[in-house]
Structures are given as structure tokens and as C-alpha cells.
């Protein structure tokens, strides 16, 4: 097993242990604890590439979790899985739902921008420059929002915004 994979497995195991300890000691309702357990199980399955299992756990967590902030991270992770599966429309839907509950998720804005940029590139390959420009404009808006939330991140996005004259 490569060293990076061993390190990731160690980090995942450490996170799971700490999460289980916190789950026992933090005063929360049984529903909140159960939702968190499903969320952790979803993250574990996702990190192992078991996306179907991860989605099942995330959907269970969504059913139990009432806090909008916590729900935003569940929705965000569901979006990541749909992105990984090439289901970009579904991914955009889940990222939007995450942002509705927590507008301070720069990574969701970034992921939405990446999908829009990809769709713009696809439109160019299909010879539809008008549609491509619309997708690129949408990508620019999402990247601007991500950069507003975390100005020191997404440097490549800032470079793209600058060279395409979309930074303002």
C-alpha cells in the first residue's frame, strides 16, 4: 500500500475514533447522535469509494438531522458523490441546496463553478459558443463567490477570471 494511502487510512481511522468519542460525550439528543453516526458512516464509505453505501447513509442522516448548518454539509457531500459519478445536474442541485442552508461554503461554490466551466468547455467542443459563454459566465459568478468567502484560496480560478476579463 502506498504511503499516502496508509496516511489517509490512518487519518480516517483517527477521525472515526474521535468522532465516536465526541458522539458519546457531547450532550445531544439521540436523533442528533444517530444522524451524526450516519454522516460519519457516509464519509467513511465515501472515502473508500463506496458511493452507493455513502448515499444511503447520507440520506438517512438527512432524514434525522434538523439543523440547517449540519444538513448543508450532508447535502454538500451528496453533491460530491454525484459529481464523481458524472451526474452534474444532480450535483449542482445538491450544492445549491447546501448553499441555501449555509451560504458560507466556498467549496460548494467552487465545485459548482468547476461543473459550469466543464459544461462551457463541452459547449465549445460542440461548436456552441453562445451556450459556452453562458456557462463560463455562471462559472465566473460562482468562483467570485468562493473567492469572496476565502480570498486566499482558488488562485487558479482567480487567474482564469483575470485572463478571461471576468474578474469584475
Swiss-Prot record:
<dbReference type="GO" id="GO:0015979">
    <property type="term" value="P:photosynthesis"/>
</dbReference>
<dbReference type="GO" id="GO:0042170">
    <property type="term" value="C:plastid membrane"/>
</dbReference>
<keyword id="KW-0802">TPR repeat</keyword>
<comment type="function">
    <text>Essential for the assembly of the photosystem I (PSI) complex. May act as a chaperone-like factor to guide the assembly of the PSI subunits.</text>
</comment>
<dbReference type="InterPro" id="IPR019734">
    <property type="entry name" value="TPR_rpt"/>
</dbReference>
<dbReference type="GO" id="GO:0042651">
    <property type="term" value="C:thylakoid membrane"/>
</dbReference>
<feature type="repeat" description="TPR 2">
    <location>
        <begin position="72"/>
        <end position="105"/>
    </location>
</feature>
<keyword id="KW-0602">Photosynthesis</keyword>
<dbReference type="InterPro" id="IPR051685">
    <property type="entry name" value="Ycf3/AcsC/BcsC/TPR_MFPF"/>
</dbReference>
<keyword id="KW-0677">Repeat</keyword>
<keyword id="KW-0472">Membrane</keyword>
<keyword id="KW-0934">Plastid</keyword>
<feature type="repeat" description="TPR 1">
    <location>
        <begin position="35"/>
        <end position="68"/>
    </location>
</feature>
<feature type="repeat" description="TPR 3">
    <location>
        <begin position="120"/>
        <end position="153"/>
    </location>
</feature>
<protein>
    <recommendedName>
        <fullName>Photosystem I assembly protein Ycf3</fullName>
    </recommendedName>
</protein>
<dbReference type="InterPro" id="IPR011990">
    <property type="entry name" value="TPR-like_helical_dom_sf"/>
</dbReference>
<comment type="similarity">
    <text>Belongs to the Ycf3 family.</text>
</comment>
<dbReference type="InterPro" id="IPR022818">
    <property type="entry name" value="PSI_Ycf3_assembly"/>
</dbReference>
<dbReference type="Pfam" id="PF13424">
    <property type="entry name" value="TPR_12"/>
</dbReference>
Amino acid at each position: 500500500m502506498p504511503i499516502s494511502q496508509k496516511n489517509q487510512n490512518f487519518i480516517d481511522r483517527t477521525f472515526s475514533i474521535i468522532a465516536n468519542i465526541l458522539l458519546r460525550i457531547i450532550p445531544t439528543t439521540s436523533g442528533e447522535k444517530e444522524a451524526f453516526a450516519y454522516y460519519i458512516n457516509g464519509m467513511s464509505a465515501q472515502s473508500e469509494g463506496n458511493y452507493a453505501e455513502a448515499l444511503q447513509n447520507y440520506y438517512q442522516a438527512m432524514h434525522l438531522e434538523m439543523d440547517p448548518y449540519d444538513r448543508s454539509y450532508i447535502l454538500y457531500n451528496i453533491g460530491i458523490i454525484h459529481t464523481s459519478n458524472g451526474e452534474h445536474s444532480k450535483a449542482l442541485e445538491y450544492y445549491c441546496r447546501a448553499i441555501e442552508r449555509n451560504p458560507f461554503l466556498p467549496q460548494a461554490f467552487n465545485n459548482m463553478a468547476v461543473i459550469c466551466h466543464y459544461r462551457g468547455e463541452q459547449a465549445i467542443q460542440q461548436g456552441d459558443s453562445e451556450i459556452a459563454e453562458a456557462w463560463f459566465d455562471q462559472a465566473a459568478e460562482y468562483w467570485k463567490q468562493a473567492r469572496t468567502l476565502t480570498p486566499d484560496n482558488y488562485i487558479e480560478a482567480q487567474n482564469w477570471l483575470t485572463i478571461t476579463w471576468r474578474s469584475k
